[in-house]
Structures are given as C-alpha cells and as structure tokens.
Design a protein with these regions (language model features):
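Conserved beta-alpha-beta core of the PfkB/ribokinase-like small-molecule kinase fold
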Residues: 121, 127-201, 217-220, 225-228, ...
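Structural alpha-helical scaffold elements that stabilize or flank donor/cofactor-binding regions
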Residues: 114-115, 174-175, 204
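Short, electropositive alpha-helical surface patch
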Residues: 52-64, 170-178, 263
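Alpha-helical segments flanking ligand/cofactor-binding loops in enzyme cores
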Residues: 31, 57, 144, 173, ...
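Conserved N-terminal subdomain of the carbohydrate kinase-like
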Residues: 39-126, 152
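Glycine-rich phosphate/adenosyl-contacting loop at the front of the ribokinase-like
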Residues: 1-65, 88, 272-273
Length: 314
C-alpha cells in the first residue's frame, strides 16, 4: 500500500501536507531481504492506478521481482495516513483506507497457493488476514500443513483498527499455529490473546518450529525445536510425567509434546529513535535472512536487531 507521513507533528486534522512513501508488512520485508542480497518475489494485487504504479516501481527499485503483482481494474490501491509519533508517550494516529482495495480482493481463487509455494520461504502477515473474508480464506490455505509447501513465516502484526470484529483476532492464533516461523510481540500477544510472558505464548503456540517473541527495548527471545522420535512404550501402567519448561534466556532445553525447545534471548541495540515505522518488518527480514543463510539462533536475533536498528534511525 501507499503510505502518507506527515510533514510535521500534530493530529491529522492539523497536518497541512504529507510525504508519500511505500508501506505494507510483506513488501517491507521483501525490500529488506532483497537489499540483503536474497532473490525475492513479491506477490500481491494493486489497483490499475497511479498509486499502484508508484508502489510497484518503488518495490522493484530494491531489486524485488514484482512479476507476481496483479493489477485490479475495478479496485484502488490501498493507502494509509500516519501522524508523527509523540516521543514522550509513543502515541500516534493511524487511519487506513484499505476496505475495498485491490489487495482486499485476494483470495484462493485468484492467488492460487501452488503459485505461492515456488520459493524456499513464504512470508505472510496477519494484516492481510484482516482485510476481508477472502483474504482470510487465502491465509488459511497458505498456512495449511500440506505436503510440498515451503517454509512458512508468519508475522502476527495485530492491527486492531483493521479488524471488523474485535473477536476475530483469535484467528491470528490459528494462522500462527500453521506456520513454521512465527514473529509476535509480547504486547500484541497480551492485547490480542490475553497471553502474558514468553512461556505463556509458547504454551499457546507449540506447533511452530521457531517462535520469535519480540520484547521491544528488552530484546527478543526465540524458541527453536526439532521434533523428537516417538518413544518406545514403557511396559506396565504408570503415571505420566512432564518436564518443566526452560526459563527464557537460558539455553536449557524445554520438553513439550512437539519436541524439545532451545530458548535463546538477545538484547536489543540501544539507538536514538528517529522513526519507529517499519522496525518490526526490518527485524523479521534480518532474522529470516540469517535463517536462509543457516546461522544459529543467536545470530538470527542479532541480524534482526541490526536491521531494526537501521530502520529506527533512518
């Protein structure tokens, strides 16, 4: 989508002009990954309008393959407006104009899952699921655990302003359970699912092989696990037992029905924040870049922090 940022601080009613740029969680991640040297293809729908032209050209300028972007002659390109963040309160105003947009018309019928599974990694966002029922159906199809799909990455990206029914954010939990790599902030897990703390989030999301919990200035924690083979049955009856979970930040494995977790935490970098827009997407891109390069968990988190710091200070 096209993003409009204010020329000066203040409420939307008082801002006289805006600067046009590009936005969108998935396209942000695509641009950062391409800048990091990866081959990236962005697949979406935009309007057959000037904003769509600007969006496609701008994303392609980062080296992203935009051949998978479809033009919709009947629906416009989505836009949103954002006010400057108040550094004292971290408050800002966001207004979306995405209802009825070209992207909101994405569905399993016009965005075939098999066409999206051609790469090594498929990155998705919970924002898309909030745009329409068709988009939600597409997201359900893409997170279904079926043979032949690529590694699926899912950033929860809870945006209350986009959900028509506030209780609908529970579907984000279902979508996350279908992914292999999941990104979620502690704050959004609390707001969307009433889950507090890393252990509670992992308990609710045991399925993903990699769960990245973002903790703002405190850093990030990643749970990684490999499935364990089924144990041989013990002879005779006996009580079931379970091992305690690991404390986030330690390297002690934690047992679960899905295998054993290794938990690693890395603190965030200290930077002077200029603009917080896009930092979460940059973090995800940095983590995924390191994942594609086969780096260990701590290095993946460090790459995420480095990319996020670059976004925060530009």
């Amino acid at each position: 989508m096209v993003t409009f940022l204010p020329s000066r601080p203040g409420p939307l009613a008082d801002v006289p002009s805006f600067d046009r740029t590009i936005g969108g969680a998935e396209s942000n991640v695509a641009c950062v990954l391409a800048a990091a040297g990866h081959r990236v293809r962005w697949i979406s729908r935009v309007g057959a309008d000037g904003f769509g032209d600007h969006l496609v050209r701008s994303v392609a300028a980062y080296g992203v393959d935009t051949s998978g972007v479809r033009r919709d002659p009947d629906r416009p390109t989505g836009v949103y407006f954002r006010t400057a963040t108040d550094r004292a309160t971290d408050a800002h105003e966001v207004v979306y104009y995405r209802a009825g947009s070209a992207a909101s018309a994405m569905s399993p019928e016009n965005m075939a899952p098999e066409d999206l599974w051609s790469g090594t990694l498929l990155h998705l966002s919970g924002i898309t699921a909030a745009l329409s029922d068709d988009c939600l159906a597409l997201m359900r199809a893409l997170t279904a655990r079926v043979p032949g799909r690529p590694l699926v990455s899912f950033d929860v990206n809870h945006r209350p302003n986009l959900w028509r029914d506030p209780s609908g954010v529970r579907v984000l939990l279902d979508l996350a359970r279908g992914a292999d790599v999941v990104f979620v902030g502690e704050d959004e897990a609390a707001a969307a699912w009433d889950l507090h703390g890393a252990e509670a989030i992992r308990a609710a999301l045991p399925e993903p092989r990699t769960l990245v919990i973002k903790r703002g200035a405190a850093g990030a924690t990643v749970y990684t696990r490999e499935p364990e083979p089924e144990p041989e049955p013990e002879p005779g009856p006996g009580p079931e037992s379970s091992a305690p979970g690991a404390v986030p930040g330690s390297s002690v494995p934690a047992a679960s029905a899905y295998g054993r977790d290794t938990v690693v935490s890395v603190p965030a970098l200290r930077v002077e924040v200029v603009a917080p827009v896009g930092a979460g997407d940059a973090f995800a891109a940095g983590f995924l870049s390191a994942t594609l390069r086969g780096l260990p968990a701590a290095a993946r988190l460090r790459h995420g922090h480095l990319m996020a710091a670059a976004a925060l200070t530009v």
